[in-house]
Amino acid sequence: MSPSNKGTVLALILALTMVVVNGFSSRFFVEKSSLTVLNSWEMGAKHDAAIANFGLPKYGGFMIGSVVYAGQDAYGCNSFNKTFNTKSPYPKILLIDRGVCNFALKIWNGQQSGAAAVLLADNIVEPLITMDTPQDEDPDFIDKVKIPSALILRSFGDSLKKALKRGEEVILKMDWSESIPNPDERVEYELWANTNDECGVHCDKQIDFIKNFKGMAQILEKGGYTLFRPHYISWVCPKELLLSKQCRTQCINQGRYCALDTKQEFEDGYNGKDVVYENLRQLCVHKVAKEKNTSWVWWDYVTDFNIRCSMKEKKYSRECAETIVESLGLSLEKIKKCIGDPDADVENEVLKAEEAFQLGQENRGIVTIFPTLMINNAQYRGKLERTAVLKAICSGFKERTEPSICLNSDIETNECLIENGGCWQDKRSNVTACKDTFRGRVCECPVVDGVQYKGDGYTSCKPYGPARCSMNNGDCWSETRKGLTFSSCSDSETSGCRCPLGFLGDGLKCEDIDECKEKSACKCDGCKCKNNWGGYECKCSNNSIYMKEEDTCIERRSGSRSRGLFTIVVLTAIAGISLGAYIFYKYHLQSYMDSEIVSIMSQYIPLDSQSINQDSFK
């Protein structure tokens, strides 16, 4: 390529930098995890660590490990050819110094030595920075890095080395549980991408990720658990280069929105203008689909486009794209209207909004490379892989609001399966206060079959409310003997246990009261008392009847006198009813019938003054 072409390309690259510098609120963010010293010289002290942009950070989780220093191989630029042993039962966290070789190689060598995680100690005094992969190369081992790693400040690294040199054991907790903000029950995330499929390894990784993550993304979006937005990086052509061949082939709308041709073949094949045009179309596909409340269709479109309209197969065209749009039932006219005229000297509202997002805001960093994933305004760090990204998204839900897909055993450990998570449980009723969450577990008294349990969730949970006795008898005493059951739980009371009548105790344990022995009942003269479980029997002498409520005996009368008295009462009642019926007929019913007869006869026989004295009919 000629020197003039090189200068033009350099100017285009620097254009973004100029925009970034001029953006008042734009800045780069370092995504961090937390380190806590669990023993040794500064127990409980917390430190920040910068998450590496490769490997697999444990988003939403944590790990505890014993720190080991690499010693004479401190830089870790060559294979250690050994494993680092410690007396601690915890996994090994290898401490390596920064310098000499790239970050990723150090972490790879640490993983090969058996380390569960790697800490890189900075070798200069500076704020934390993000460890990234080499830009001019992409070694094969990058995708094989599976462990988490982080950069720490030089001062903290020096403190760790001194403690280890003194022979102290250093136990650290590496915590990613708050690395992704988790404010509510919906996660908002965005993917900064590019439609160019001939830009090398980065493009291939992006295409593979979209294809593999599509199913999960659509489940989350359809369920209303997430809000997804696609974004595309664009550049600005400097005004002095607007008429150059480079700007004309890489930009639309008179140099306002450009996509660099990484091959720098400005006259052959596809160029940046084609790419930024398709970027805009994909943004419009999402916009139109969202208006139909089917925003997840974007994943179908992009997946199909990568398969059917590939640059490598010379099918990257407007016609191919529009065929996919129509096959998905989207309005082609609305999408064309959204795209507008790419040759017009006007701003495009969709791409203008993209520039604002790209420059970042006060609470989020600037985006300069693709693919970049943002989750709740935090930049995702690590390998762009389906399960790893799902873990990061799941860590963005407020605890106990995550969807079931986040509690799959493939991506999280159910802590309730190990010693019930340290929470209260009732094995008899199979009720537990342990609730599995993506970031761990919570101990919270449950609601079972409409019955609310109350307590601290760790050592105690008791059923509460009207139906509490249906759950393990409300944790109250209950016993059955010879088919007879007594309980100290009452549905009329919302809490507490009270021994029933005939028993004495605290409600958790009740003992039968011997009323006969204590002479609390059957105290009448000549009575004989017999104690039963939960009660007693009392018999009177001389064939008398025992009245329990009064605790007394009454004389039983002879059968003949009783029958005679009963007969007299019945006959008297019958006579009274007959007399009442006769009086009713005589004075009320007869009067009513007389008036009815007068009314009927008046319709057929003329009567004096249209009335007849009722007495004349009596």
From Swiss-Prot:
SMART domains, sorted: EGF_CA (SM00179)
GO terms under biological process: protein transport
EGF-like domain mapped to chain residues: 412-462, 465-511, 512-554
Disulphide bond pairs: C416-C434, C423-C443, C445-C461, C469-C489, C476-C497, C499-C510, C540-C553
Molecular-function GO terms, alphabetical: calcium ion binding
Tissue expression summary: Expressed in seedlings, roots, leaves, flowers and siliques.
A Pfam cross-reference name: VSR_TRX
InterPro entries in alphabetical order: EGF-like_Ca-bd_dom, EGF_Ca-bd_CS, PA_dom_sf, PA_domain, VSR_TRX
Topological type in the membrane: Single-pass type I membrane protein
Keyword Transmembrane helix set for record: yes
Annotated signal sequence range: 1-23
Ranges of residues in domain PA: 58-164
Keyword terms: Calcium, Cytoplasmic vesicle, Disulfide bond, EGF-like domain, Glycoprotein, Golgi apparatus, Membrane, Protein transport, Repeat, Signal, Transmembrane, Transmembrane helix, Transport
Subcellular location: Membrane; Golgi apparatus membrane; Cytoplasmic vesicle, Clathrin-coated vesicle membrane; Prevacuolar compartment membrane
Segments on the Cytoplasmic side according to the record's topology features: 585-618
Transmembrane segments: 564-584
Listed GO CC annotations: clathrin-coated vesicle membrane; Golgi membrane
UniProt-listed CDD domains: EGF_CA (cd00054)
Lumenal side: 24-563
Glycosylation-annotated residues: N81, N293, N430, N542
Record motif Tyrosine-based internalization motif, residues: 604-607
Function: Vacuolar-sorting receptor (VSR) involved in clathrin-coated vesicles sorting from Golgi apparatus to vacuoles.
Family the entry assigns: Belongs to the VSR (BP-80) family.
Domain text: The tyrosine-based internalization signal may be involved in trafficking at the TGN.
Protein name: Vacuolar-sorting receptor 5
Organism, as annotated: Arabidopsis thaliana
